[in-house]
Structures are given as C-alpha cells and as structure tokens.
C-alpha cells in the first residue's frame, strides 16, 4: 500500500502544508513588487528620470511571472478544501465561503481589470492612466491579502458566528465581527510588512549581484539603495508589529505561545527566554537549554517577575507540537534580526559614502536575498502548527475536518503535486532567475515590445508622446 506508513489525516496535512508553502512564496513577492512598481512609476512621473522607467520595465517582467504562478498555485488549494477537507468545507463554508467569494469579487476583478493595462499598455495609454492601472493592481494585491488573512484569522480567533443544530458555523448578526476578528489586524499588518521586506531583499540581492559585476551600473545602484532604505526603515517596524502580534496571541491562543517559548512547565516568578534547546515532546522537557532568566516574562508581560503558565496547564490532547514551533519561531526571529542588522549596516555604509563600494555588504545582501521567503514560511509554520489540533481554534479539530479518504489515495495525490509543482514552478523560478541575471539597462522595453502596431487604441486618451515627463539627468542618491 502506498501510504508510507502515514495516516490519511497526516498525508492530507502534509499535502496542504506543501502546497500552501509553495503558494505563498509568490504572493509574498507579488504583493511587495506591485507596490514597488507603483513607487517606481510614480517617481518617473514626478521626476522625469528615465532610470525609474527602466527599473519599472525591468521588474514588471518578474512581477508578471510571480503573479501568474501565485494565481495558479492558489487555485489548487481551493480544490483541496473540497477533496481532502470536505467536512471542514461543509461545516465552516457558511462563514469562509462568502469571505473567499469577496476576494474574487473585489481583488481578483480589480487585478484582472487593470493587469493587462499595467503589463502591456505602456505604449497604448497615457502615462498617468498607466500609473493608475499600476496603483489598482497594487491595491488589488493588498485587498486579496485582506480577505485571505481575514479567513485565516477567523480560523485562529473565531468570532461573530452562530452554530446550527447540526454543528455548522453560520454568520452571526454582523459580518464585521467575523472579518475584523481579534487577531486579524495584527496578522494583516505583520503579513503585508513581511511581503514588503521579502521584496526589498530580493531587489537588494539583485542590485548587489549586478554591483559586484559592474559597480558603476546606475540602475543597480538605485535598486540597491532603495532596498537598503527599506531594510533599515521597515525591519524595526516589522519587529514591533511581531511583538504586538505575539501579545495578541498570548491572550487568545496561549498554548501557541507556550510552545513557541518552549515553556513545558509553568513559571511562578518570572519565565526565562530560551535561546536554544532541544524540545522533547514525549517527555515534556527542553534538553540542553540555554536561557536568559526572566526575559520571557519581560517581553510577554512587560514585568520582570510576572508569572507565566506552561503547557502543564493545557490538556495534552490540545497541545501543539513544541519541537516544530520552537524552531520555526526562532528561525523567523533570527532572520528578522539579520534583516535589521543588514539594514543598519547599509545605513553606516551610506553615512560613510561607501554604499556602492563595500563589497562585503553586497555579498551579505546577496546571501540575504531569499531570507524573506524563508522567514515567511517559518512564520506561517508557526501560525498554523500552533493552531493544532484545531482547524477552527477551540471548536473544530483537524481530525474532524478531514475527508473520509484512504491513505493511499491521498499519498498518490501528494506525490503528483510534488512532481508537478517542482516541474512547473521550477521552470517558472528558473525563468525569474534568468530575468534577474540580466543587468538592468537604459531603454529596457519591459513586456511591451510590439513592432509595426499602433501605440494605443483609438480614443481620446493622450498617448505617451503627449504625457511623457521631461527627462532629467540621472543621479543616484
């Protein structure tokens, strides 16, 4: 039997973890890139410097590939709700179904309406109309994140619902209570900032790569400079947002925080912060622990000696996996601190006038290029594993949510997904690397290379020749 010794439930969880992790790589880039493209085009319109237009055309190609792969991989997860998690869909569909439909009716239609203009309309509409299309696509990516995060947050902190006699979740008197559930604002801010940081480090890595090869490339200098500003300014904000999110989680999902901190036992007079340790879920202890006394109480309660309960106060059947949470959380935090360190290093280099000369800084930025993706996956692993053993926290368990499938059937689909994903998205990822390997240059035509065709459709909208900003000499600050 092709089940690899796992139950159907475990295989279904593995399959969803694989597909959702693979999927979120692309939205975390497209959300940030859409806003970055809007900034670049806005700067071009304001300053008239063709360098910004060149960078827009350079990155819009990467955005197109990432956006397409994000859409395709996202559709797969919708089908998984019906195949592997049909009981969950049946019981919670009354709440999450409309929320996901709202995403289609708002974000998807907004993106679909303006994406073609953004990608292919630079020579067909006026620059300000094109900029409006870019802004609408950026807004669409944010609105999409809004609805998806609302769905996930409701599963984490469910409010505003009613239970039917047969155990189904139904909308209560106010949809606002469902949408703006207790963890939603914190998770939305944390997720969107993570997407911006992810994009900043991808842009910074690309700029660093080309600076290492051609230090005088003005386009690479501008990319790198903008990315380092983002790292220095946004990384501290993300750390603060993460701290606020953690305090909210402590209030509504204390078992998740206990597992993240490695607190198997309660601490009556201040809990230590464990920097390192090997969690032993079976024996409920943390081996080889390296701790700083009382700091966990200081961070979580803002009181050096505040008591903190441990997992010994939670029913063993309702505890998440400490081993996974302990390390995924530390991986996320460690990368966040590394991002902050690189941003501060960039500030020092800028202050000394060496931002484009310190090759060690460029190499470090290159190494940190994929760090945002790793941190995002680690963060979502912390969020989702910490919710276990529930799909709807405290109300519907994961075991109760699964479809009545045989393990070999789920294993076969898991293998198929792995093979297809690595083949299809492997090619897409390779193509993105190919695009980034080509240095940005003046006169980049983006996706709008069309010979012998009209520059724009018939109508009264001014063409680019009438609305194009006056070009000014290039400088990199």
Regions found by a protein language model. Name each.
Residues 2-477:
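Polytopic transmembrane helical bundles with strong interfacial aromatic enrichment
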């Amino acid at each position: 039997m092709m089940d690899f010794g796992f139950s159907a439930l475990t295989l279904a969880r593995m399959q969803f973890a694989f597909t959702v992790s693979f999927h979120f790589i692309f939205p975390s880039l497209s959300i940030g890139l859409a806003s970055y493209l809007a900034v670049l085009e806005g700067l071009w319109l304001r300053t008239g410097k063709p360098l910004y237009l060149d960078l827009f055309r350079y990155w819009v190609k990467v955005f197109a590939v990432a956006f397409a792969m994000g859409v395709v991989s996202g559709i797969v997860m919708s089908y998984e709700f019906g195949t592997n998690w049909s009981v969950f869909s049946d019981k919670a569909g009354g709440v999450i179904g409309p929320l996901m439909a709202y995403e289609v009716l708002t974000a998807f239609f907004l993106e679909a309406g303006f994406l073609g203009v953004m990608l292919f309309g630079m020579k067909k509409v006026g620059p300000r109309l094109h900029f409006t299309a870019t802004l609408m696509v950026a807004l669409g990516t944010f609105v999409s994140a809004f609805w998806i995060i609302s769905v996930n947050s409701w599963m984490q902190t469910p409010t505003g619902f009613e239970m039917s006699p047969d155990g189904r979740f139904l909308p209560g008197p106010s949809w606002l209570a469902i949408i703006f559930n207790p963890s939603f604002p914190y998770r939305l801010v944390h997720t969107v900032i993570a997407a911006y940081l992810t994009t900043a480090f991808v842009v910074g890595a690309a700029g660093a790569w080309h600076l290492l090869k051609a230090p005088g490339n003005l386009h690479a200098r501008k990319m790198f400079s903008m990315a380092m500003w983002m790292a220095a300014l946004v990384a501290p904000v993300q750390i603060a947002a993460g701290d606020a999110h953690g305090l909210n989680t402590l209030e509504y999902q204390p078992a998740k925080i206990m597992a993240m901190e490695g607190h198997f036992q309660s601490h009556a007079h201040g809990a230590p912060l464990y920097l390192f340790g090997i969690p032993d879920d079976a024996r409920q202890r943390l081996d080889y622990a390296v701790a700083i006394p009382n700091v966990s109480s200081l961070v979580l309660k803002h009181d050096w000696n505040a008591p903190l309960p441990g997992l010994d106060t939670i029913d063993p059947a309702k505890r998440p996996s400490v081993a996974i949470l302990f390390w995924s959380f530390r991986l996320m935090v460690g990368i966040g601190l590394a991002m902050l360190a690189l941003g501060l290093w960039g500030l020092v280099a800028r202050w000394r006038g060496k931002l484009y000369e310190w090759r060690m800084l460029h190499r470090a930025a290159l190494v940190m290029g994929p760090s945002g993706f790793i941190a995002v996956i680690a963060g979502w692993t912390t969020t989702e594993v910490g919710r276990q053993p529930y799909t709807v926290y405290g109300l519907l368990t994961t075991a109760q949510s699964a479809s009545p499938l045989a393990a070999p059937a789920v294993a076969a689909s898991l293998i198929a997904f792995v093979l297809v994903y690595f083949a299809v998205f492997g090619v897409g990822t390779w193509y993105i690397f190919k695009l980034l390997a080509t240095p940005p240059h003046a006169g980049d035509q983006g996706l709008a290379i069309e010979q012998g065709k009209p520059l724009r459709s018939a109508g009264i909208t001014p063409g680019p020749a009438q609305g194009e900003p006056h070009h000014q000499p290039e400088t990199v600050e």
